[in-house]
Amino acid sequence: MKKLILYPLSILLFLSTNLAAQTCCQLETMGDYQLLGGSLDFIRAHAEPLPFTFVSKEGGEMVSFPTKDSTGKAGGFLIKAKKKSKKWLLVYQEWWGLNDYVKKQAEAFYTDLGGEVNVLALDMYDGKVATKREDAGKYMGEAKEERLESIMQGAVKFAGKRAQFASVGWCFGGGLSLKSAIVEGKRAVGCLMYYGMPIKDVEKLKTLNTDVKGYFSGREKWINKTVVEEFAKNMTTAGKVLDYKIYDAEHGFANPSNPAFDKAATEETYAASIKYLKMKFGI
């Protein structure tokens, strides 16, 4: 395992043949990652999720909370700790939206953390969930940086003044997880990211209050080895720690609805994530 660090988010969008030829090597911010929503290559690399319905066994339910922007509110899937707790895990969706696969994974984290942590899977698309990859690309591309950050800020306030946070996300959510750690400020205690686009802005990375643990794909052409190694250098420059591993697997390897699902890599990363979170939360 190597040591390293992570990234932000921004805005802008879209399209055309130019974009289809663009790779993640050329993309520098979260907003740049959103540009991939118009890339045919990137869209076609994502198989559509199989139908799945999740029913919570731990009392998970949809909740809403205020935000300071013009929308005024946001939502998420919340599973409360069995006893009152200041520990919160914020879970960030893939580009599909807050679907039942994400809710199931959020509940798995809750269960394997012994019910000692409040787990909140945030709805970053305000109720929109894609089942078609073209829609997923559209939703990701349309997401505004200001709105995404407002949702994060609302969640932090919803958790309470004494809350401490860790975050986890996949794909689009991997980038959001890093951004979340920055938004959480001094109350951030941990950050996990799965094959998410890193932040290049060293000044923003310097504001992190936590290390970052990352899992990346060695077979994809977007967030590839070059991108990850540059991220590692930027983290070092920022004086932060990134603990990462590049797997011999495709983008989306931890998604069970993905034909590229890699069971061994998924089990290894999940076990490492639970160990990391238990250490960070003192469980």
Can you say where each PLM-predicted feature lies in the sequence?
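Short beta-strand/loop motif that positions the catalytic acidic residue
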Residues: 214-216
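A conserved short beta-strand
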Residues: 187-197
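Alpha/beta-hydrolase fold nucleophile elbow
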Residues: 159-170
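Acidic catalytic loop of the alpha/beta-hydrolase fold
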Residues: 219-223
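Serine-hydrolase catalytic machinery in alpha/beta-hydrolase-like enzymes
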Residues: 24-42, 49, 53-56, 62-158
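Short alpha-helix in the alpha/beta-hydrolase fold that links the catalytic acid
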Residues: 105, 224-234
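C-terminal catalytic histidine-bearing segment of alpha/beta-hydrolase fold enzymes
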Residues: 238-283
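Gly/Ala-rich beta-loop-alpha elbow adjacent to hydrolase catalytic centers
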Residues: 169-173, 177
